[in-house]
Amino acid sequence: MVSKSLIVLLLVSVLVSTFFTTEAYPASYDGDFDALDDLDDLDLDDLLDLEPADLVLLDMWANMLDSQDFEDFE
C-alpha cells in the first residue's frame, strides 16, 4: 500500500514539475530545436540547476538517441 502511494506521489510530482517547466520554458515545447544544441554548452553548474522534469526530459532524449527506432527517422 505504501509503495503504491509512493509511486503515485512520484508520478504526480513529475507531472506537476513538467507542467511548471512548460510554463517557464514554453519555447522548448514549440519545436525550438536550438535548445538541443545548447545541451553541448552545459557545465556542472548548469546541471546542478536543472529541475527534475528537465532531468526526465534529458533522460528520455538520451534514450531516444540510443534506441534503434531513432535511426529509422534519419
Swiss-Prot record:
**Hey, what tissues is this thing expressed in?**
Expressed by the venom gland.
Q: Which UniProt keywords apply?
A: Antibiotic, Antimicrobial, Secreted, Signal
**Can you quote a single GO CC term?**
extracellular region
Compartments in which it is found: Secreted
Highest taxon in the source lineage:
Eukaryota
Segment forming the signal sequence? 1-24
- Any GO BP annotation: defense response to bacterium
> Where do the coiled-coil regions begin and end?
none
Recorded family membership: Belongs to the non-disulfide-bridged peptide (NDBP) superfamily. Long chain multifunctional peptide (group 2) family.
Q: What does this protein do?
A: May be an antimicrobial peptide.
Name used for this protein in its record:
Anionic peptide clone 10
Protein's organism: Tityus costatus (Brazilian scorpion)
